[in-house]
Design a protein with these regions (language model features):
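Catalytic cores of alpha/beta
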Residues: 102-109
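Glycine-rich beta-strand-to-loop/alpha-helix junction loops that act as flexible
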Residues: 3-5, 91-100, 118
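Adenine-nucleotide phosphate-binding core of ATP-dependent small-molecule kinases
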Residues: 52-92, 99-102
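Glycine-rich phosphate-binding/hydrolytic loop that grips phosphoryl groups
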Residues: 113-135
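Structural motif
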Residues: 17-18, 92-94, 113-114
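Phosphate-binding/catalytic loop of phosphoryl-transfer enzymes
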Residues: 1-38, 72, 76-84
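Glycine-rich phosphate-binding loop plus the immediately following alpha-helix
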Residues: 20-70, 124, 128
């Protein structure tokens, strides 16, 4: 999974082939869609592009403040998407991207099932390059 502007879930088959995927708006994109597409909902605070600081994320499951409720709803929707994908695939999940740490922090499906791999794309490119050079 790549948790960036879009949460991209990619299934890889046992023999290493593309097995399909799912795409949903990422954390910031969902918040922006609510703020821009709904009268009365505020814009959320501008956060750095690289991460969502834990101290600004609401810890309550049902926050009373509007922005906190928006943030909590988005993270719960993303986690539910990941949980259903994991149940359907029955495999391990690797997550990378700017929101990966936020999702892993709030994941309750077992740490052995969701592995944070910050440089997953770079590792894949290195593996591909090694395979190409050995052919």
């Amino acid at each position: 999974m790549d948790a960036g502007t879009v949460l991209s879930l990619t299934r890889v088959t046992a023999d290493g082939c593309f097995g399909g995927g799912q795409l949903i708006p990422g954390y910031r994109l969902q918040l922006r869609a609510m703020a821009e597409g709904t009268v009365g909902l505020p814009s959320t605070p501008k956060l750095p592009d690289c991460e969502v600081p834990r101290e600004v994320f609401p810890q309550e499951v049902f926050p009373q403040q509007t922005v906190a409720a928006m943030q909590r709803g988005v993270i719960q929707a993303m986690l539910a998407t990941i949980a259903v994908a994991q149940q359907n695939s029955k495999g391990l999940l690797w997550i990378c991207g700017g929101d990966a740490e936020l999702l892993q922090t709030h994941w309750s499906g077992g740490t052995e099932l969701l592995q944070l791999e910050g440089d997953l794309q770079l590792q894949a490119l290195l593996d591909l390059a090694a395979g190409i050079s050995s052919d």
